[in-house]
From Swiss-Prot:
Belongs to the universal ribosomal protein uL24 family. Part of the 50S ribosomal subunit. InterPro entries: KOW (IPR005824), Rib_uL2_dom2 (IPR014722), Ribosomal_uL24 (IPR003256), Ribosomal_uL24_CS (IPR005825), Ribosomal_uL24_KOW (IPR041988), Translation_prot_SH3-like_sf (IPR008991). The keyword Nuclease does not apply. One of its GO terms (molecular function) is rRNA binding. GO terms for cellular component: ribonucleoprotein complex; ribosome. This is Large ribosomal subunit protein uL24. Keywords: Ribonucleoprotein, Ribosomal protein, RNA-binding, rRNA-binding. One of two assembly initiator proteins, it binds directly to the 5'-end of the 23S rRNA, where it nucleates assembly of the 50S subunit. One of the proteins that surrounds the polypeptide exit tunnel on the outside of the subunit. One of its GO terms (biological process) is translation. It comes from Chlamydia abortus (strain DSM 27085 / S26/3). It holds the Pfam family ribosomal_L24.
Length: 113
């Protein structure tokens, strides 16, 4: 499996789709399908049938997953492109480079979910 810079809890920027330009927090990562669920993005309406608990039935809004290639990590409110940098001791780090300066983001092995 390819490394992914997006983890649960990260703030991401949506690059493509109906919600292009929106930002949201990653709720879950579906690594097998290369998809992520982002809070407030790609919201779908689901109808719940009538039952004893719900005599009238109801509609609920749920976030549907979107492909990971359609999101990019948001750092300082803007989409950021990250690269992997290997330090002298062999540790791999996600590195943000902009305007020729490098900024460490986090370790590659550090996963929140």
């Amino acid at each position: 499996m390819k490394r992914r810079s997006v983890c649960v809890g990260d703030t991401v920027y949506v690059l493509a789709g109906n919600d292009k330009g929106k930002q949201g927090k990653v709720l879950s990562c579906l690594r097998e399908k290369n998809k992520v669920v982002v809070e407030g993005v790609n919201v779908r309406t689901k109808n719940i049938k009538r039952s004893q608990e719900n005599p009238k039935g109801k509609r609920i809004n749920i976030e549907a997953p979107i492909h990971i290639s359609n999101v990019r990590l948001s750092i300082d409110g803007a989409p950021a492109k990250l690269s992997v940098k290997v330090t002298e001791n062999g540790r791999e780090l996600w590195n943000k480079s902009s305007d020729g300066t490098s900024k460490l983001y986090r370790s590659v092995k550090e996963r929140k979910g």
